[in-house]
């Protein structure tokens, strides 16, 4: 048996336990690489777009273990059309039921930082998790949610080591 420095045996059960707790960084240490899920981008409720944070929503055909509800820093990985190359796009990833909007269905949505021009509908993408930013929360107001989302983007940029980006276009918020 191979044991980790903590004395625990490396196992897929350990990885699933870490993911269930939202510890994607711990899962990456056990796996030896970042945890990734795959799915097809589908149409959602377009709430993110109306708030100035367009998202790529994964359909229910997700491959891989979805981590605990929360907001994560990570990457959207897509095939570059017409090539054999992959494009890694920095992303703030939301996993959960969207309690702010009384959501019932658990979803995975990724907002690509600094990009509002992407049309990923129908594409099969990978979502790679680097670090958990925070648990899923409900806020008292739309402004509270928007302020937190801006902070989530800044934290995501910091974790990923890229330039700080705020909301795509604050004037585009149509949900007020």
Where are the regions a protein language model picked out?
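Contiguous mid-protein beta-loop-alpha structural module that forms a pocket-lining wall or clamp
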Residues: 1-30
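General secondary-structure edge motif
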Residues: 7, 38, 125-129
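Hydrophobic alpha-helical segments and helix-packing faces
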Residues: 8, 20, 34, 51, ...
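Basic side chains
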Residues: 9, 16, 36, 47-49, ...
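Charge-rich, low-complexity N-terminal segments
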Residues: 26-31, 37, 42
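Residue-level detector of secondary-structure transition/capping positions
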Residues: 34-35, 153
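Phosphate/ribose-recognition catalytic cores of enzymes acting on nucleotide-derived substrates
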Residues: 44-176
């Amino acid at each position: 048996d191979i044991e980790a420095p903590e004395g625990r045996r490396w196992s897929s059960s350990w990885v699933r336990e870490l993911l269930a707790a939202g510890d994607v960084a711990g899962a990456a240490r056990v796996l030896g690489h970042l945890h990734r899920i795959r799915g097809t981008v589908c149409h959602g409720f377009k709430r993110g777009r109306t708030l100035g944070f367009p998202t790529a929503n994964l359909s229910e055909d997700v491959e891989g273990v979805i981590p605990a509800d929360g907001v994560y820093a990570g990457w959207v990985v897509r095939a570059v059309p017409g090539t054999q190359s992959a494009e890694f796009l920095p992303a703030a990833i939301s996993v959960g039921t969207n309690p702010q909007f009384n959501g019932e269905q658990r979803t995975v949505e990724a907002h690509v930082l600094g990009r509002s021009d992407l049309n990923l509908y129908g594409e099969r993408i990978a979502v790679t998790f680097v670090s958990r930013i925070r648990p899923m929360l409900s806020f008292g107001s739309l402004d509270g949610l928007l302020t937190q989302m801006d902070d989530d983007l800044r934290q995501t940029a910091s974790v990923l080591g890229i330039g700080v980006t705020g909301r795509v276009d604050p004037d585009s918020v149509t949900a007020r």
